[in-house]
């Protein structure tokens, strides 16, 4: 992108609505409740021929530095310092407040270009608020309606004037790896090659877990900076925020998500939106790190989150966080491994790593587990190897006989990866018991080294050409 723009203003003036309008999709949560946005969220904006990086920020308020609102303010000020230009959004419908005046003074002291944006200008009675905005001393306000998309051409012109035409329209080459590409399903039936794993491809990783498990602290430790808002309060994160960083030459895009509580406890509309946003992050990710609080692990909600991730077909890694607070580490680790195997039978062999997001202990091992798990998630096995394996499995444990007739498994192939899925041609596929399917899945995990990922097997019986004749007679 040619330049970076921060959207700033007091709470509930429509900053996230404008952000969503500029990126062309609903990335930021929007609600009437003030203070929905807490972390700074970047996005790729397009506006009438302009392309730039846009940053949504928390509403600015006067607050003590150590309070939650104070830490939110620090995140917003960091975005202003990072940006080349600020869009200062005021509410033309409800008029100015003393907070607007204080923010205008703060932006003036920064000495960076500012575009004053009078949002909600479509509302009846907004003229008074629009003209009041002149008193802020930041030049002529640009009237817009972020909700209805009005005034976008004027906003484009104001940005170009503030940043300069040469800077506004500067071209920049975009590498292929900068483009988000959804997981592909272009693997063809019966393909007999086992392609090498691409260790240079950018990797999307979602960090999920219960509230206050230490997800944001973990990502901040990876980044080496206080990029995400953290604190003792549960439920600080609301939006799913993505950040990029480099690990040993590979681009990692991590998604911080809101803490996920049991559905029965989620009553507020805003929390429901946050959980839905976290679910979207899981579906977009390739590997999901499920963060447990090692001091109180394996709550019922932890198990449900693991089950959800596996049902979505994602590669999963368990991270037992707050390891710095554990005293008898060897005994606790042995207990955690026993409980993992017992309580998560559907995730047999899943990688589980003790870590401390606070101190950074164990993070290299966690990243290597993420890479190894993604390698398995992308794994392809040749048809020839699969059919030799299938023959051996049937010799060791033949399929059961149903009504005196033994089921025959004739042919096996991998139909897709991400996650690995297989098709087996057999007789009487509808009669094959679930226990035999589990036997085959466990065999695939053990013989082809495939822990930590969901494995799916589909059975198909060949069409019987005489079936229609039987029905006619």
Curated annotation (Swiss-Prot):
Residues 379-463 form the KH-like domain. Residues 3-167, 203-378 form the EngA-type G domain. Keywords: GTP-binding, Nucleotide-binding, Repeat, Ribosome biogenesis. GO terms for biological process: ribosome biogenesis. GTP 2 binds at residues 209-216, 256-260, 321-324. GTP 1 binds at residues 9-16, 56-60, 119-122. Pfam families: KH_dom-like, MMR_HSR1. GTPase that plays an essential role in the late steps of ribosome biogenesis. HAMAP family: GTPase_Der. Associates with the 50S ribosomal subunit. This is GTPase Der. It comes from Rhizobium etli (strain ATCC 51251 / DSM 11541 / JCM 21823 / NBRC 15573 / CFN 42). The lineage of its organism: Bacteria, Pseudomonadati, Pseudomonadota, Alphaproteobacteria, Hyphomicrobiales.
């Amino acid at each position: 992108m040619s330049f970076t723009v921060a959207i700033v203003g007091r709470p509930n003036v429509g900053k996230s609505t404008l952000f969503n309008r500029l990126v062309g999709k609903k990335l930021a949560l929007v609600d009437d409740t003030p203070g929905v946005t807490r972390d700074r969220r970047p996005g790729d904006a397009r506006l009438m021929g302009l392309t730039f990086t846009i940053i949504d920020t928390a509403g600015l308020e006067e607050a003590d530095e150590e309070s939650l609102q104070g830490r939110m303010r620090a995140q917003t000020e960091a975005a202003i310092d990072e940006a080349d230009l600020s869009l200062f959004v005021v509410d033309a419908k409800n008029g100015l407040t003393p907070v607007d005046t204080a923010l205008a003074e703060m932006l003036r002291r920064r000495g960076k270009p500012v575009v004053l944006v009078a949002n909600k200008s479509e509302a009846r009675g907004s003229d008074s608020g629009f003209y009041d905005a002149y008193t802020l001393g930041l030049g002529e306000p640009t009237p817009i309606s972020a909700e209805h998309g009005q005034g976008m051409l004027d906003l484009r012109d104001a940005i170009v004037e503030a940043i300069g035409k040469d800077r506004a329209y500067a071209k920049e080459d975009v590498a292929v790896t900068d483009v988000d590409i959804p997981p592909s399903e272009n693997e063809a039936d019966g393909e007999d090659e086992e392609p090498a794993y691409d260790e240079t491809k950018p990797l999307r990783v979602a960090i999920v877990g219960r509230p206050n498990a230490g997800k944001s602290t973990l990502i901040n430790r990876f980044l080496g900076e206080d990029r995400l808002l953290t604190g003792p309060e549960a439920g600080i994160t609301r939006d799913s925020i993505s950040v990029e960083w480099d690990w040993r030459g590979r681009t990692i895009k991590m998604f911080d998500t809101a803490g996920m509580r049991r559905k029965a406890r989620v009553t507020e509309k805003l929390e429901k939106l946050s959980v839905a946003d976290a679910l979207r992050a899981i579906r977009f990710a390739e590997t999901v790190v499920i963060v447990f609080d090692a001091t109180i692990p394996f709550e019922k909600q932890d198990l449900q989150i693991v089950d959800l991730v596996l049902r979505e077909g994602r590669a999963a890694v368990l991270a037992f966080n707050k390891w710095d607070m554990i005293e008898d580490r060897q005994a606790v680790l042995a207990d955690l491994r026993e409980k993992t195997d017992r309580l998560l039978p559907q995730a047999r062999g899943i990688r589980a790593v003790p870590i401390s997001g606070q101190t950074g202990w164990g993070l290299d091992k966690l990243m290597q587990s993420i890479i190894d798990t993604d390698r398995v998630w992308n794994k392809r096995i040749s048809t020839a190897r699969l059919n030799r394996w299938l023959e051996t499995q049937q010799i060791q444990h033949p399929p059961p006989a149903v009504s005196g007739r033994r089921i025959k498994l004739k042919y096996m192939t991998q139909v897709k990866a991400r996650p690995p899925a297989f098709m087996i041609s057999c007789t009487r596929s509808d009669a094959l018991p679930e226990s035999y399917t589990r036997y085959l899945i466990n065999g695939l995990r053990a013989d082809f080294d495939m822990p930590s990922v969901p494995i799916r097997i589909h059975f198909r019986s060949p069409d019987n050409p005489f079936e229609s004749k039987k029905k006619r007679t």
